[in-house]
Design a protein with these regions (language model features):
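Short acidic/histidine-rich active-site segments
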Residues: 218, 259-266, 301-304
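Short, hydrophobic/aliphatic alpha-helical segments
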Residues: 24-43, 208, 243-257, 287
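Intrinsic disorder at enzyme termini
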Residues: 281-332
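C-terminal substrate-recognition/cap domain of FAD-linked oxidoreductases
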Residues: 58-62, 68-245, 252, 256
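Short beta-alpha connecting loops at secondary-structure transitions
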Residues: 234, 268-275
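FAD-binding subdomain of flavoenzyme oxidoreductases
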Residues: 1-98, 316-320, 326-332
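Conserved, mostly hydrophobic/aromatic
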Residues: 48, 227, 294
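Acidic/polar loop patches that form or flank catalytic/metal-binding clefts of enzymes
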Residues: 24-25, 94-96, 152-155, 260-262, ...
């Protein structure tokens, strides 16, 4: 529900901990603002690479009095994508705005029997929460926008049990995918909302290119994709094609104005993709920040920043039989 309530960054007021050298740090404050650079945002977004966190002060919000959910069917993914953009353009910020394509809908319906329209090419789940009066007005406005942009069917939850049933398919998308494929790789990228249909059509072409199926489920409201590439990890060639497929999705997302991650982070899986999104100079600047906080490279070494030389710089390069890896590449 970060579309309405914000990301982790927007809900953390203060972080306390220690650097790798044992120096105490404190970023942010209990007050709404703090002087100096916004190091709190830097710490929250660092994936544990800059400091060891011991204490986090978070913002709490009241639990809404009521929540209701719209389930809308579309006979075309472009119409569904356009409807997502239209909801936001109308000044409506739903508590949740999720989308599933036909393969994913079929998988979850067989698993949890949520009552999804199996003839639909895409399904949107749009949730409104707040006071009963606010919810009633917002549900009516969203229904009107969805109808105007091609929804073939619209159902509105009339009870808490029905709302949970609508959501049960979305929340069980990953385990449902495990029923239709031995393995799957979940990707995580973000694109502008207006390109939702474009990326889905591009992924459909990639399915043909790599000869692998893909089921799509994602946080449509903020353009955060979670394509699930279906494959068999016991087949080395399928694994190879799956990894290429995933990298292609990330590169295409960047080309469409998006990013290589939305919420899962970079870690080691997306190191190469960081070179697609950022220039060598930009990656070097991020590495400089890392060195300033952690000069010995003790915290999450080898993560996020794609620079080979750091392994040699820190004396952590693995050498077997006196032969370093990639001897042709420059080192310091």
């Amino acid at each position: 529900h970060c579309l309405k309530y914000g990301l982790t960054l927007h809900n953390v007021l203060q972080v306390r901990g220690f650097t790798a050298q044992g120096e105490p740090i404190s970023f942010g404050a209990e007050a709404l603002d703090a002087p100096g650079y916004d190091l709190l945002s830097l710490a929250v977004g660092s994936e544990g690479m800059l400091a060891v966190t011991l204490e986090v002060l978070v913002k709490l919000v009241p639990k809404p009095q009521l929540a209701r959910c719209i389930m809308a069917s579309f006979d075309d993914v472009r119409k569904a994508g356009d409807a997502v953009a239209a909801v936001i353009a109308a000044g409506i910020i739903p508590a949740g705005l999720e989308m599933m394509d036909k393969p994913m809908t079929a998988a979850v319906e067989d698993f949890v029997h949520a009552g999804y329209d199996l003839s639909a090419q895409a399904i949107l789940l749009c949730e409104s929460d707040g006071t009963p009066e606010e919810v009633e007005e917002e549900i009516a406005r969203m229904s009107e926008v969805l109808s105007r942009h091609g929804a073939t069917a619209i159902a509105v939850s009339q009870s808490e049990a029905e709302r949970l049933r609508f959501w049960s398919g979305r929340k069980n998308a990953f385990p449902a995918s495990g029923r239709i494929s031995p393995d799957y790789m979940c990707m995580d990228s973000t694109i502008p909302r207006k390109r939702l249909a474009d990326i889905l059509l591009a992924i459909a072409e990639m399915e043909k290119k790599y000869q692998l199926r893909c089921a799509n489920v994602f946080h449509a409201g903020d353009g955060n994709l979670h394509p699930l590439i279906l494959f068999d990890a016991n087949d080395p060639d399928q694994l190879r094609r799956c990894e290429l497929f995933g990298a292609d999705i990330l590169e295409t997302s960047v080309a469409m104005g998006g990013t290589v991650t939305g919420e899962h982070g970079v870690g080691v899986e997306k190191l190469n993709s960081m070179c697609v999104q950022f220039s060598a100079a930009e990656n070097a600047q991020m590495f400089a920040v890392k060195r300033a906080f952690d000069p010995q490279g003790l915290l999450n070494p080898g993560k996020v920043i794609p620079t080979l030389q750091r392994c040699a710089e820190y004396g952590k390069e693995l050498v077997r039989g006196g032969k370093p890896k990639h001897p042709d590449l420059p080192r310091f």
